[in-house]
């Protein structure tokens, strides 16, 4: 084709393509019919020549460059409804063969578009984002993104010199999705979406559904395959059940341990090799990871994510993370992920004003802006936003084997007036303060995970008294499996901060939690939030001198492990780190090496033994959420600050927990018990092994048939100072009890016989009575 006559369509598309605002490139570029012939149009701004090749490499036509902007047109001698062709493109320094993206049809099915628009696609991450695939025998990447209000969206990356003119995408008006298949793009390629918004502004955005991201401060998404599904271990998921022991070790991967020589992070492999054996040895059943979805600012600890589907690149690749989780499972340890779906940061490469409109967030800052955190609130009422967030729960459980999600800042999600003054928030449609859309999102997501999650659990960090957090949605609940008990944590830590002499006046701070214990399924949390921002460490919250602080801490942990509810402890607290947590440094492991570890080693040993005892005795966990599993034995001894309660298992076995929160030894302290048997002190926080003063009961404790505290039997104890002791009861064997009962019955019969009067005795008594009566007359 030597000459070319421009049409109005040509002139229009030359302007659209060269000025980079073409919304429908597939209607013009690629193979099209033109009367009795076919034409192929190619737009390559930097090219000097373009030839059309057949599948076997034969030149079918040489394209004519009809505009300096880079538009080439090739005419074929016959009509083709479809054609497997390639491009041979000449540049100033070389000539290379390329596939034409505009010859490939969309792989988005009508059903996908419909489900995505409706917000009911269970797994939109299988469609949206960047997916390695083969189309018509050609390998490449299928890109798709939701941006309904954009004028134009292009894929840009290191494969097209980040030039938004080269690969504009196809728009699906019915769903607002843009897509394109780019041949020969490979795993590891960097990319973003260049978006022209309705105001003519260019926005360079990371992929919301990216499966990998660049290491900060760079912000490009990285092409990688959708992770394969993980086969669920039913036994491990059973370990999430309410009648199982759950002891959670909360970890920030960036500061648990670091390389001493340069203060740099361990990678996922190094973490797996060190963290998992440690957690296993310490007796924890679960690891909870602070957020590991990609985030730009280290100081956010991961709580301001920009890539919910992308594991942070700080510690390695997504496959490395999957290996870490697999190794935890092999060790019998479940993994929980801190899940942040309440807000997102304002970083320009993220979700904020994604297509120029308030797409993921609310437009009105009274609904869409978090004043406390300078973040934006998701618009849960928008179908596509709901779908984006809800399916993320399945992504982590199915593709990484995550066993549970801990949902961050639930209170900020469900209340429209959270941390706002009057006039700073908008009521819901009924005039109330509840965020009905957020509640609907949580209910539907929890219901979906119950159905699809194969036993994965969802835990709420919810700090108010909102009713029904762990109740079923069918009962007007929200459907979480567990809820953090922030009230118990705050009350008990306040109590422990008091000098023992004043604790008697605040006795109820340790007992009040039982008033609402069975309203929800609670986790007792001593989390990262309690050891930052000037709150000091958990050890630092304890009252007294150094010895008393450690004794108080051991006693407090004992009370916590004995109390109903699952356990959570933030890293460093297991060995009583003295300073606040610093996300930018390793924990103070050196404390365990100084002078043999001293008091810190004592606390470490105590926590290890608490965990092991907790798992050994079903009484300490089986009936956490059943009133039949707990009974106060001593609840009102405020003058001596002593507490005692009994934990019971389904089979009736029990463990008694006794705490003394004064530095005074309580000798000969009698506690009523419900059954006779052998009582044994199985744990004592004051033992020398834990660096205590070694006061205790030294083995078996005699049970006596002396009534006390309304019980038929009792035991007499020596309760160490600032301590918690655990006492296991082994009831007398049934045969022994029956034998004793038989002996008692025989004795009673013998006694009755001994006291029963004979006939002779009756006769004598009668005569004496008659004589006395006669004399009286």
From Swiss-Prot:
GO cellular component labels: cytosol
GO terms of biological process kind: glycogen biosynthetic process
GO MF term set: 1,4-alpha-glucan branching enzyme activity; cation binding; hydrolase activity, hydrolyzing O-glycosyl compounds
Protein keywords: Carbohydrate metabolism, Glycogen biosynthesis, Glycogen metabolism, Glycosyltransferase, Transferase
Quaternary structure note: Monomer.
Taxonomic classification: Bacteria, Pseudomonadati, Pseudomonadota, Gammaproteobacteria, Pasteurellales
Active site, UniProt feature: 408 (nucleophile), 461 (proton donor)
Enzyme Commission code: 2.4.1.18
Gene3D superfamilies on file: Glycosidases, Golgi alpha-mannosidase II, Immunoglobulins
Gene behind this protein: glgB
Pathway as given in its UniProt record: Glycan biosynthesis; glycogen biosynthesis
Protein name: 1,4-alpha-glucan branching enzyme GlgB
Keyword Mitochondrion annotated: no
Presence of keyword Transferase: yes
Similarity comment: Belongs to the glycosyl hydrolase 13 family. GlgB subfamily.
Matching HAMAP family: GlgB
Disulfide bonds: none
Function of the molecule: Catalyzes the formation of the alpha-1,6-glucosidic linkages in glycogen by scission of a 1,4-alpha-linked oligosaccharide from growing alpha-1,4-glucan chains and the subsequent attachment of the oligosaccharide to the alpha-1,6 position.
Catalytic activity: Transfers a segment of a (1->4)-alpha-D-glucan chain to a primary hydroxy group in a similar glucan chain
């Amino acid at each position: 084709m030597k000459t070319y006559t421009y049409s109005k369509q040509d002139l229009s598309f030359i302007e659209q393509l060269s000025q980079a605002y073409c919304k429908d490139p597939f209607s013009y570029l690629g193979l099209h019919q033109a009367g009795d012939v076919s034409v192929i149009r190619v737009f390559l701004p930097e090219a000097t020549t373009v030839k059309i090749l057949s599948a076997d490499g034969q030149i079918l036509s040489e394209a004519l460059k009809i505009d300096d902007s880079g538009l080439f047109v090739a005419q074929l001698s016959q009509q083709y409804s479809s054609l497997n062709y390639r491009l041979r493109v000449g540049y100033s320094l070389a000539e290379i063969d390329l596939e034409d993206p505009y010859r490939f049809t969309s792989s988005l099915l009508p059903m996908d578009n419909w489900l995505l628009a409706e917000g009911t696609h269970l797994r939109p991450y299988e469609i949206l984002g960047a997916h390695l695939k083969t189309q018509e025998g050609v390998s490449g990447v299928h890109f798709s993104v939701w941006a309904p209000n954009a004028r134009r969206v292009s894929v840009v990356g290191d494969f097209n010199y980040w030039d938004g003119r080269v690969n504009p995408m196809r728009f699906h008006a019915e769903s607002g999705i843009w897509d394109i298949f780019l041949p020969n793009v490979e795993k590891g390629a960097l990319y973003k979406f260049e978006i022209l918004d309705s105001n003519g502004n260019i926005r360079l955005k990371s992929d919301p559904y990216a499966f990998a991201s660049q290491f900060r401060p760079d912000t490009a998404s990285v092409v990688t395959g959708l992770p394969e599904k993980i086969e669920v271990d039913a036994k491990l998921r059973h370990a999430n059940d309410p009648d199982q022991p759950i002891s959670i070790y909360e970890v920030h991967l960036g500061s648990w341990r670091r390389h001493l020589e340069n203060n740099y992070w361990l990678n996922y492999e190094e973490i797996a090799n060190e963290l998992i054996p440690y957690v296993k040895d310490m007796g924890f059943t679960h690891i909870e990871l602070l957020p590991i979805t990609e985030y730009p600012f280290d100081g956010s600890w991961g709580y301001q994510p920009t890539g919910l589907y992308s594991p942070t690149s700080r510690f390695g690749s997504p496959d490395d993370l999957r290996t870490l989780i697999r190794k935890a499972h092999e060790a019998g340890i479940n993994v929980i992920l801190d899940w942040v779906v309440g807000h997102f940061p304002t970083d320009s490469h993220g979700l904020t004003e994604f297509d120029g409109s308030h797409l993921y967030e609310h437009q009105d800052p009274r609904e869409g802006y978090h004043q406390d955190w300078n973040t934006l609130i998701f618009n849960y009422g928008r179908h596509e936003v709901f779908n984006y967030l809800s399916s993320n729960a399945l992504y982590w459980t199915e593709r990484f084997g995550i066993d549970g999600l801990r949902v961050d800042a639930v209170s900020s999600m469900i209340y429209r007036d959270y941390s706002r003054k009057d006039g700073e928030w908008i009521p819901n449609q009924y005039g109330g303060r509840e965020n009905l859309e957020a509640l609907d999102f949580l209910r539907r997501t929890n219901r979906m995970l119950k159905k699809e999650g194969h036993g994965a659990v969802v835990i709420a960090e919810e700090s108010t008294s909102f009713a029904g957090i762990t109740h079923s949605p069918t009962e007007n609940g929200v459907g979480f499996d567990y809820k953090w008990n922030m009230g118990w944590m705050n009350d008990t830590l306040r109590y422990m901060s008091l000098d023992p002499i004043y604790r008697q006046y605040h006795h109820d701070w340790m007992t009040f939690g039982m008033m609402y214990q069975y309203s929800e399924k609670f986790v007792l949390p001593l989390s990262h939030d309690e050891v930052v921002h000037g709150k000091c460490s958990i050890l630092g919250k304890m009252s007294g001198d150094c010895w008393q602080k450690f004794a108080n801490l051991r006693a407090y942990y004992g009370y916590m492990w004995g109390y109903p509810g699952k356990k959570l402890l933030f890293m460093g607290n297991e060995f009583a780190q003295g300073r606040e947590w610093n996300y930018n440094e390793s924990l103070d492991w050196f404390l365990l090496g100084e002078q043999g570890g001293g008091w810190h080693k004592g606390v470490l040993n105590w926590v290890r033994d608490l965990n092991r005892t907790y798992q050994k005795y079903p009484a300490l966990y089986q009936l956490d959420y059943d009133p039949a599993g707990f009974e106060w034995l001593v609840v009102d001894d405020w003058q001596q600050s002593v507490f005692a309660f009994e934990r019971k298992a389904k089979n009736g076995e029990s463990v008694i927990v006794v705490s003394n929160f004064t530095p005074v030894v309580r000798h000969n302290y009698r506690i009523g018990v419900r059954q006779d048997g052998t009582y044994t002190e199985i744990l004592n926080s004051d033992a020398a092994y834990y660096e205590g003063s070694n006061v205790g009961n030294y083995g078996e404790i005699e049970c006596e048939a002396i009534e006390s505290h309304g019980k038929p039997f009792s035991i007499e104890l020596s309760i160490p100072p600032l301590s918690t002791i655990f006492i296991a009861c082994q009831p007398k064997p049934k045969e022994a009890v029956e034998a004793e009962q038989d002996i008692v019955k025989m004795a009673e019969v013998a006694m009755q016989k001994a006291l029963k009067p004979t006939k002779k005795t009756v006769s004598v008594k009668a005569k004496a009575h008659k004589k006395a009566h006669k004399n009286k007359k």
